[in-house]
Every structure is written in structure tokens, then in C-alpha cells.
Amino acid sequence: MSPFSIVLIGFAMSTDAFAAAIGKGAAMRKPQWRDALRAGLIFGCIEAITPVIGWLLGRAASSYVSAYDHWIAFVLLGALGTHMIVAGLRNGPEEAEDAASDTPKRHGVLGLATTGFATSIDAMAVGVSLAFLDVHIGVVAVVVGLCTFSMVTAGVMLGRALGNLIGKRAEMLGGLILVIVGSVILYEHLSGAA
């Protein structure tokens, strides 16, 4: 897998966390940099670990499905991407109410970690699909973690001003990127096999 594809996956995986960070930032009256950095660190660490867990699970099953690995990666990335696009198109009234609230909130480590884990489930599934490709999972984990750290830190700081508008678009963009990466993986395999 090319370095460019790995970076694309890193940013695609961080868009859910970015959308959540915008909501977190919107819930705070005036988020400080330390709040944003703390959220970025928590989300980034969780988002870096989950694809490794998925990769380990995928590696355990890889000998059984190696003839179909490119299709598995395509279907998983395509399904996750489509899900993210559909979720981005939906109008989430609960998220809108949370973002519109003027009540300042502090977000504790447990609350941030719970949200971070919830937004990283897709990264675990991507990790499963990466087990079937020629990729160094350590590099992917670091890239995903750094992308998530950056996106969440920026998301918290942008949250108050921008609200859910950017968050939904970021999720749709991330989904589109996953669909494209999955399609490229399938195309590269099929064109190389032909």
C-alpha cells in the first residue's frame, strides 16, 4: 500500500472523531488549547490501537481467505465508507441539540475515552481489511493516531464556531475516501492479476 493511501486512510478514519470533537467543542463555552490537546491525545491513542486489534484478528483468519482478500478489503472499506456517507446525510436531532446548547460542559477522561472508542470501531474494521494487504500495521497505527490527534484537536477548537455543519460534511468526506481506497485496492489487484 502506498504512503499516500495510508495517509488517506488515516484522515478518513479520523473524520468520525473530528465530527465528535466539533460536538464536544460546541458544548464548551470557550474551549482552551489544553482541552483540545487532551481530547486529541485520548482519541488519537484509541484510534491508533483499534486498527492493530483488527489487524491481529484479520491475520488470524488470513490463511483461510487469502484468495479473496482483495474482495474482503473492498467490501469492508466500501461498506464502512457507505455507512459514513449515509450517517453524514442523516439529520441527527440529538447532536444538533447538544451542539446548540449554551451550557458549558467539561469533558472528563472517561467520557472522552468512551466517545473515542465509539468513533474508532470503524478503524478496527479497517484493521481487519489491512491484514489481507501488504502493509506495515505499525506505520498505519502511527499515521491514524497522528491524524486523529490533529483532527480532534482542531475539531474541539473549531466546534464552538462551526457546530455540526462541518462535522457532517467531514463524515461524508471520510466515507467517500474509504470507498475510493477500497475501489483502488480492488482495481490494483484485478489489474495485476489480469
From Swiss-Prot:
Q: Which GO terms describe its cellular component?
A: plasma membrane
Top-level lineage group: Bacteria
The molecular function terms of the Gene Ontology recorded here are: manganese ion transmembrane transporter activity
Where the protein is mainly located, per its record?
A: membrane
User: Can you tell me which residues the record assigns to a coiled coil?
Assistant: none
The regions listed as transmembrane in this protein's record are 3-23, 37-57, 69-89, 110-132, 147-167, 172-192
The protein's role, per its UniProt record = Probably functions as a manganese efflux pump.
- Name of this chain's protein: Putative manganese efflux pump MntP
Organism equals Xanthomonas euvesicatoria pv. vesicatoria (strain 85-10) (Xanthomonas campestris pv. vesicatoria)
